[in-house]
Amino acid sequence: HLSIRRQRQMCIRDRYNTLCEYTFTESSQQMDYSYRTLFAGALEDAKQVLEKTTNPADRFATTILRAYAFQIMVDNTSDSPYSEALQGNANATPKWDTGETVYKGILGEIDAAEAALDGSGMDVPDLIFNKNIAQWKGFANALRLRMYLRFIDANIDAASYTEKVKTLVQNNEFFTGDVKLDCFLDETDKRNPWYNTNAVGLTGNHCAAYPLISYLSSTGDPLSLIH
């Protein structure tokens, strides 16, 4: 039993053993967690905002968040529903577009939304940048940079995207500080829900698993001392 448990977290902690052992099945929550969270949550919310508002600044910020969600999805699954996504029961089995198609699509969305800005401010509450459009533009540029680098790494129009990277870096118009929902406090019932559940309620389960520790130790990685 000890040899089995050594492959896991610790003898007294077993919440994430399925992750350590890669014992996933088709019914495992982890298999489609990103898909369900992003499409049923974030992307559906963004769709509703875009359908209801005509304010260019609100649409710009929402488009950036929509692009960010799709970018994460592509990084997780390579291909992703995009051109036929978010139609609900009208199309319950949307086509999965290539990551290249999705990236180019959302880059175009960002460009169009930014071009539509007319100097007006945001109407909706903004818990990320406090309605600072310059910061939203900086976030958009950071997303562009990330996707350009992905294209270069995949050798897709590498020369063209290399020039785009050089231009972004030279202009240096990125956000400052952090991109975060700045509305939580370290007080009961006021913490980030994820933090409240995992960092406060399940602290003991947050320990490095045996496969990680054994690898770090065998390679002499100083991170083993931290973990």
Stretch-by-stretch model annotation:
Residues H1-R8, I12, I226-H227:
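Single conserved hydrophobic/aromatic residue that forms the stacking wall/gate
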Residues R15-I226:
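Structured, solvent-exposed acidic/aromatic patches
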